[in-house]
């Protein structure tokens, strides 16, 4: 059953890329939902991802672990967008900011240019 604490919305682009917009809490109870959503995107051929944290109120170690799982699963690029100071601090302190770093790119603009 989907959590009431995390909403995941996906924008798919014809370039094999997608933006995943999160709202709520990314924690022990909800992190598997993000991993599953990204796995489904990969199965559908979306390998380049932006994960938009603009609506995330809380991210705990399980949320960080989900990002590592996504990274290790072979997604070509993961860009983390709109990180609040707490999440940015966690990523910096754990070394994940460097591990997950990807060059900035505007997937929506790129999709418009292709289409």
Stretch-by-stretch model annotation:
Residues 1-58, 62, 66-115:
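STAS-like cytosolic regulatory interaction modules
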């Amino acid at each position: 059953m989907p959590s009431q604490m995390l909403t995941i919305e996906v924008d798919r682009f014809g370039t094999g890329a997608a933006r995943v917009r999160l709202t709520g809490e990314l924690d022990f109870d909800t992190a598997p939902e993000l991993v599953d959503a990204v796995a489904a995107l990969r199965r559908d051929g979306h390998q380049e991802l932006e994960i938009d944290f603009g609506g995330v109120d809380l991210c705990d170690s399980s949320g960080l672990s989900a990002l590592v799982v996504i990274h290790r699963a072979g997604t070509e690029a993961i860009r983390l967008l709109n990180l609040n100071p707490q999440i940015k601090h966690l990523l910096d302190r754990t070394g994940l900011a460097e591990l997950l770093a990807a060059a900035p790119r505007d997937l929506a603009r790129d999709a418009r240019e292709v289409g």
